[in-house]
Swiss-Prot record:
Keywords: Cell membrane, Membrane, Transmembrane, Transmembrane helix. GO terms for cellular component: plasma membrane. It comes from Mycoplasma pneumoniae (strain ATCC 29342 / M129 / Subtype 1) (Mycoplasmoides pneumoniae). This is Uncharacterized protein MG135 homolog. The keyword Transmembrane helix applies.
Length: 285
């Protein structure tokens, strides 16, 4: 990791500390929802106008003139289809997650935040901190993005922090979240697989792991290197990465439900105390 890449770590840690530092005040003032709305609006607008609109209107923004994605070596038509239909999990969360926050759909927003947090985390710490950077590129890398990876860092950075804010500021988690994460994963991956089938042969990557190409590049490739797996064995990388991802998402769901577990314990103790009191009153009578 280059010295410049430590800036990614520093900014991310600083962002986390800011969220944690303001959480007690925000909860005390009971302005969680308004803060989440502002945060969600910033993420949505940044990603939509900094990235999404470029692929919706490629002729206007000049992306049609580029033959290939210089970073991932993916044909531009494939990249455009993936971006327009949100076939990658992180862009999906960045644009759809804020909508459910505005609609006050706490449970849906919470489930999306679990996936958004995990996806952003593995990209920030599994890929972006290893991206070769020149000093003159750092500002563009942080705020605009390099080549066809428009607002790549900022999208994952803001998604990571918004997800954390949802965990800390929202009260939309319950035990049923364990069921919802499986429903969402099944529904979203089925949607991606359907779109890949509809555009058969036209989409070659950026499909949240549906296509083998996804497992041979980016953060998944770095996972393979870290675990000393065969970097060309897509099936092995898929199996290991899927298992680790599933474990991480379930663990995240457990962690965000800690307040729920605490409340259940308190409720159980209150019920037990009430029964003891009732029994004592009956014996006195």
């Amino acid at each position: 990791m280059q010295s410049l890449n430590y800036l990614v770590v520093i900014l991310t840690v600083a962002g986390v500390l800011v969220i944690l530092g303001f959480t007690p005040l925000i909860r005390k003032l009971k302005i969680q929802f308004y803060c989440l709305q502002v945060f969600a609006a910033i993420l949505f607008l940044y990603v939509f106008f900094g990235r999404q609109i470029i692929y919706i209107f490629p002729d206007i923004y000049g992306t049609a003139a580029k033959a290939k994605n210089a970073v991932a070596n993916v044909p531009l038509d494939s990249l455009r289809l993936s971006r327009i239909f949100l076939l990658d999990l992180c862009p999906f969360f960045a644009l759809i997650g804020p909508i459910f926050i505005f609609l006050r759909q706490k449970k849906v927003a919470g489930v999306l935040a679990i996936f958004g947090f995990y996806g952003a985390a593995i990209t920030l710490f599994g890929e972006l901190i290893f991206t070769p950077l020149k000093q003159e590129e750092i500002v563009k890398f942080l705020f605009v993005g390099l080549e066809n990876n428009q607002v790549y860092f900022m999208m994952h950075f803001l998604s990571f922090l918004l997800s954390l804010a949802v965990f800390l500021w929202d009260d939309g988690f319950s035990l049923i979240s364990f069921f919802y994460i499986h429903v969402f994963a099944l529904a979203y991956l089925s949607y991606v697989a359907l779109m890949v089938n509809i555009f058969k042969g036209q989409i070659t990557g950026n499909t949240t792991g549906i296509l083998a190409e996804d497992w041979l590049s980016g953060e998944y490739k770095n996972v393979a290197v870290f675990l000393k797996l065969d970097p060309k064995n897509a099936d092995l990388i898929f199996g290991v990465s899927f298992g680790l991802s599933y474990f991480a998402i379930v663990l995240l769901t457990v962690l965000v439900n800690i307040p729920t577990f605490i409340q259940l314990t308190k409720d159980k103790q209150m019920v037990k105390l009430a029964l003891q009191l009732k029994k004592a009153q009956a014996s006195v009578a």
